[in-house]
Amino acid sequence: MRIGYTLMGEQRSPRQLVDDAVLAEQSGFAFLVASDHLSPWLEVQGHSPYTWSVLGAVAQATTSIPFMTFVTCPILRYHPAVVAQKAATVQLLSDGRFSLGLGAGENLNEHVVGKGWPPVDVRHEMLAEAVEIIRALWGGSFVTHRGRHFQVESAKLYDVPDVLPPIGIAASGSQSTSLAAGQGDYLIATEPKREIVESYRSAGGTGEVVGQLPVCYGEKDKALQVLHEQFRWSGLGWKVNSELPGTAAFDSASAYVRPEDLSEVAAWGTDPQPYAEKLQAFAEAGFDAVALVQVGPEQAPFCAWYAEHLRPALQPEGRP
């Protein structure tokens, strides 16, 4: 199983994210994933730069490490035609190292354009139509599309890479795993649940499965404190996380998440063993790759510890 690194824009400035990407490549991570938010989850996180500008810089600052969005929502804040153009551009800038992770989004980021927040089944319809538009535009011809949710009028992309970015689709249930199997090239999921992977495979999905694990390297008690302060929202679950409209709502909703509750979703401290155990759960569920999220500001110490301690503790090539 490949181990990656998360460029989490909700907690880092644009320049820091580019520096983090370089450091992650030097530290031996197999790939990068980048969140795509307008807002942080919690006010204390304090950042949320425009991911696509950061990715252009990452493409130039790194040399060989693959990277993806984790994930971009192409249904409200971004029109799918614009997503098609910027994904094609980043693929060209990175010499073919980019892949496009897509999902049905969160109200947190999408409500800002004032178009409301559709029910999840409608968002999945919109996502399916958006993928259709993106792939059509990557064909390099003029595209006119008059669909149920989107209109495209005589659009053409003039800079399209020879090798198109693979499209991953985030899923947590049967409707979205079917969408990922039918229209995506790989599956994205954040929980090590075998039933998600099996649903994807049963629907005909043959691509790899990519997950994500929150971690916090550091002295154990302090690391748990940082994890709880900045990442307690992860204990709410995605059915809640997709619906809340802003940082104040997440602050309130997560007020009763206790530090010990995070043991279900995260690893922390300086001992590689808890990290390896959490990664093993993903491997046993059928995941092919997992990106670690180092919560908090200590990115350089974490990368050094990964290279010196965690990576060697795993099987060769960063595989648990």
PLM regions and their residue ranges:
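Active-site-adjacent structural elements that line small-molecule/cofactor binding pockets in enzymes
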Residues: 1-320
